Amino acid sequence: MIRNLILIVFILSFSIKGKAQDAHLSLYDAAPLFLNPAMTGVFEGNWRLHAQYRTQWKAVNFKPYTNALISFDKPVKKWGFGAQITNFRAGIGNFNAFQGSVSAAYATPIDKAKRHNISFGIQAGLTQKTIEFGLLSYDNQYTTQNGGGFDQTISSGEEFAGSSIIVPVANAGFMYFYARQQSRFNPFIGFSAFNLVTPKETYLGADNRLPIRYYAHVGSRINITEVFYIIPKALVMQQLEFSEQAYAIDMGYFLKRADLYLLGGVVYRNSDAVIVSLGLKMDEFIAKVGYDVNVSSLSTVSTGRGGLELSFTYMGHKKKPRTEKICPRL
């Protein structure tokens, strides 16, 4: 009974908290398809390729958690189509969540000047989750010999229905943005919902459902001068009783001689971390690096070291850009 209880707690920690951990991209809006399906194809260009990688908790776990993501999307008139692959890996049991999804969005202006715009998006796919139970330790494997510890050569006596499950993915989102290029303020707001079908997710045969995860993100680009802008923004996530808020400010400064933007930003994730980011934006290429400084109760163990995150985006531009931008001015 104790062994089963320990394992149930372990699995549930990944099915709920682990899912929230999935969304712990500090540079959250650098990955548009991961944040909101309504952002699929909503950019000024012919196509977009994005990759992002994150590693965290190396200071407290010899097997750190890792997130890897790659996506591609393309606008086709008012439509946008895209695909995304993500992989999340965590813990001694090599828990792994691999997901493939496709998305589609429809964006349209709601005024004659094409300044106010809305978009709707959907996303669907499959997630495979695996775990290696043989790498876990159980209470009957504990021995007092040699100072005490777990001996995995001792049989655990446990049997499981399987170490791999596949669950469906169904997500949707909405977004509004003001796209006038000459404006001092370009606000945007979006809402998205993930796990809409609340799929059954368990290795133990129980009726454990993956709850819906909701996002709200809001902000505005503020053009201070012709060469300097800031973007104050916020993100709120809710999944059952679990919640997360992130408050951030991004900045960009244009270097005329180098013909590129210097990027910087600071994010505060409530009771968890402060994230500092730096980057460059040059022509079609955007690169960012972010680092988490842990400020939670775990900081005494982690000594403040949280996670390192890398983000790369390449946008292939059209030969004749539109005179009026139709993308969120991020």
Each language-model region and where it sits:
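Positively charged n-region of N-terminal signal peptides that target proteins for export
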Residues: 1-5, 110-111
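Sec-dependent N-terminal signal peptides
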Residues: 4-14
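Sec/Tat signal peptide C-region and signal peptidase I cleavage site
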Residues: 16-20
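Subset of outer-membrane beta-barrel
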Residues: 21-330
